[in-house]
Amino acid sequence: MKLLRLCLDQIGVGRPLPWNVYNDAGQLVLRQGHIVRDEAQREGLILRGAYIDHQVHGEATDTQDLHAVREHSASLWQDVRTRAEALLLEPGEAEPFRRGMKVIGGHIEFAVVHHLDESLFELLHREGRNTPAVSHVIQAAFLANMVAIRLGWPNAMVRSTVHAALTMNLASLQRQNALHERARPLDVAERADMAEHGAQGRLLLEMLGVEDRDWLQAVAHHHPPEDGRSLTAWRHTAGDMACLLHHVDLYLAKVSSRAYRAALAPDVAARQLFHRGGGAANPFASALIKEVGLFPPGASVRLANGELAVVLRRGELAHLPEVCAVQGADGMALPQPVRRRTSEPAYKVVAAVPRGVVTLPAEAALH
């Protein structure tokens, strides 16, 4: 039996469970029809890990309305952003912090398994604007989860990676929010100062009672030293989790704009990451690009007929994503977004365009 992890808003208080619920060892915890009595029991299930049979879930979701799936995904990520902003900007006491991290990590794990394309769209096309530094680490945690699974890491290591991604900038979130709108890049002194935030973050996490050595190591070393050291040498010191976080962090920085520079198109960012990172010999860059693709959901693309479109889902083939045209070849917005078949010559994807150039109305994305 293949198990899929549940997230908080899939379990209703006072409502019968629609499936049997298992623990991570595959042992039955609650039978279908059991009524979760209160919020404490619901949250306790999530913290301990609540799972359902993959096959049963598949039968249930085959008939789900796509609109409902996408609405659920949008709601899920709004909840993640709200929780993450409260938890990361003001961590507070140790026990609530660790409990909150488990809940947020569970939400992200659930989204990777159940709503992968919809979540990529929400994160890359409709990122939160109030706290860009928090949005960045949420995006990093989601991508790191995807890539860690592709790399074949065990579940415990995947979860540690997600927690490390969420907290890799814990010591510098407020500063990074301010830097996001600054009109010039960091100077040498500022870069040296920022380079310490990994070690500072580790100290903060230790003060919050985090004892996971892999998590702490990844946060402390997710930025490689600027000493010309090779990936192999740095990987030996920092560990695989830190190396993965660095590559995810770098990719997201490339596809995000700043006040002093434009964003790169995702295909350009992917190629830069691949070639400058050592090509196929770099397992982290290779796995990231294979997972995200050249035209990920949320990316803006130009079609052969001159239209601009937004990618809704990855296709069976990397160059054939599902897209929705929003702007005509004349530069005018279309009256209504229109689905295009990228397998047809007129609607072939010829290039990606930088993030933020094209916006898809929310109602169009949900239908």
Predicted segments with their positions:
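Membrane-cytosol interface segments
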Residues: 1-102, 346-367
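Glycine-rich, small/acidic residue-mixed loop/short-helix segments
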Residues: 316-367
